[in-house]
């Protein structure tokens, strides 16, 4: 499955999260102490807060983009193609 099918989220951080998970798994297999450092660093309040903020704001942008595309589609169907 693609990461979009596995991770049914609206935010735009799906790909960076998948890359980070892959990097973590690879590093953790080779250097467990460095892997533990990365895991600990990901839990620092500043990083968690920033990540949550980005998820929240990009979700809002995704919803607005979906609404705009729906309006454009409706406008196209009614004004250009003449459907009612």
Swiss-Prot record:
GO terms for molecular function: enzyme inhibitor activity; nutrient reservoir activity. The keyword Cell inner membrane does not apply. The keyword Cytoplasm does not apply. Keywords: Storage protein, VLDL. Pfam families: Apo-VLDL-II. InterPro entries: Apo-VLDL-II. It comes from the Eukaryota. GO terms for biological process: lipid metabolic process. One of its GO terms (cellular component) is chylomicron. Protein component of the very low density lipoprotein (VLDL) of egg-laying females. Potent lipoprotein lipase inhibitor, preventing the loss of triglycerides from VLDL on their way from the liver to the growing oocytes. Belongs to the apovitellenin family. Monomer. This is Apovitellenin-1. It comes from Dromaius novaehollandiae.
């Amino acid at each position: 499955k693609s990461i979009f099918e596995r991770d049914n989220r609206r935010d735009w951080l799906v790909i960076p999260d998948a890359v980070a998970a892959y990097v973590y798994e690879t590093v953790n297999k080779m250097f467990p102490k460095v892997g533990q450092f990365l895991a600990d660093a990901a839990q620092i309040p500043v990083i968690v807060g920033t990540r949550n903020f980005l998820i929240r704001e990009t979700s809002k942008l995704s919803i607005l983009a979906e609404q705009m595309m729906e309006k454009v589609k409706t406008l196209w169907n009614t004004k250009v193609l003449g459907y009612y």
